[in-house]
A protein has these predicted regions:
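Conserved small/polar residues in nucleotide/adenosyl-binding loops
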Residues: 1-6
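Signature of the catalytic double-stranded beta-helix
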Residues: 7-92
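Residues that flank catalytic or metal-binding motifs in active/ligand-binding sites
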Residues: 86, 105-107, 154
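Short, conserved beta-strand element in jelly-roll/cupin
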Residues: 92, 103-119
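Tight coil/turn sites that cap or link beta-strands
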Residues: 94-96, 133
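Short beta-strand His + acidic residue motifs that chelate non-heme Fe in jelly-roll/DSBH
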Residues: 99-102, 119-121, 130, 139-151
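A short hydrophobic beta-strand segment most commonly corresponding to one strand
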Residues: 109-112, 136-138, 152-168
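A short beta-strand-loop-beta hairpin characteristic of the jelly-roll/cupin
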Residues: 112-132
Length: 168
């Protein structure tokens, strides 16, 4: 099982477990490849900079063997019949923490697994709590966004990159 904690990912209070990988390439779920490329405006100049490495999302087609006989595989199979998916990960946001204001290359599909009322996602300055009620959310992560957990319990989402979803 490939669990990456906040230390190995380089982001405080964040952890990820990759559920699929590039076929035959266990390194495709390690280090910065759990995060992937994103863009941010880190200072008062407002100049956008790129962080991390580009990911070839369309190559992530093999489910990690440790998770083949789990409900996550069933969910992956159902969703991949409807959407073209890239990486699918379990992402943890620890209590009282936030990500940077950033944007990603593609939309994301979220299924909240464990959450609390203080766990909020802000996309293009619109805040939304996603309850863990079995709903599937698709967020436009190509717009600037962040996720924060202002609660006192962990937030865990099943998150997949969606390669063929177009917003109006």
């Amino acid at each position: 099982m490939c669990i990456r904690d906040s230390t190995s990912l380089g982001i405080p209070h964040f952890a990820g477990i990759s559920l699929n990988q590039i076929p035959g390439d266990p390194d495709s779920i390690k280090g910065s490849k759990v995060r992937g490329v994103y863009w941010t405006k880190p200072d008062s100049t407002g100049k956008e900079v790129s962080r991390d490495v580009a990911i070839e999302e369309e190559k992530y087609t093999e489910f990690v063997k440790d998770f083949e006989h789990t409900y996550f595989k069933e969910v992956y199979d159902v969703l991949s019949k409807r959407y073209k998916l890239g990486r699918m990960r379990l992402l943890l946001k620890e209590p009282r923490s936030t990500l940077s204001w950033h944007r990603d290359p593609e939309p994301r599909l979220h299924i909240p697994i464990y959450t609390n009322p203080g766990a909020i996602m802000v996309v293009d300055k619109v805040a939304q709590h996603m309850p863990a009620d079995g709903s599937v959310w698709i967020t436009n992560n190509t717009k600037y966004h962040n996720a924060f957990n202002g609660g006192e319990e962990n937030r865990v989402h099943l998150v997949a990159c969606v390669l063929d979803y177009k917003f109006n």
